[in-house]
């Protein structure tokens, strides 16, 4: 949507780069966004999109992105739809870290790999996990992973063994789960060292399984 009004205090904040009239995309879940819908213009069932006339309120802490000028609106929205995960993939790793990405062939996985590769640098490692071996060559060609392994993310021991083998036997600093199926929680947790980070982006995540599983393995 188009920015209609900005609070005076926020306008004065150093580094704030928005102005009224800018076209932006909110990266905050609609379940957390105060939204007033005045009119529904169209419903696009094929792409899960609804065009409306209305107003939304974004708070200072909200993630957002300016609409790019060099791509179409549908393409930009498709890329930004999973922007929460790549934003964390940029924020969480440090230079030289090892990162494991489950669901490496999906849109969110590829974008996470791209951001993580830039952040960890040449001394770090970003390993993707896919289920289909046919996906490996294309992902390596894209250059978004240092290595891609084949494993079933619903089988934690299988994933752990393959992941550690791809990281010279070492546990990972960070794992990001982008798999859109259930029961992948332990596959994201097991390969990570004590005090490491596990980021669950998938909406299929059971945080009960994640919490109890992590507690159970110690």
What do the predicted segments below correspond to?
Residues 69-152, 205:
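Mid-domain Rossmann-like dinucleotide-binding core that forms the NAD(H)/NADP(H) cofactor-binding site
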Residues 24-25, 100, 199:
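Hydrophobic beta-strand signal
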Residues 179-218:
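Glycine-rich phosphate-binding loop and adjacent beta-alpha segment
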Residues 96, 145, 169-173, 216:
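Local beta-strand N-terminus motif with an aromatic residue
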Residues 156-170, 190:
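Short amphipathic alpha-helix with an adjacent loop that forms part of the alpha/beta core around
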Residues 24-96:
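NAD(P)H dinucleotide-binding glycine-rich loop of Rossmann-like/cofactor-binding domains
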Residues 7, 28-29, 34, 103, ...:
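Conserved "cap/hinge" positions at secondary-structure junctions
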Residues 1-31:
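Glycine-rich beta-strand-centered segment in the early N-terminal region that forms part
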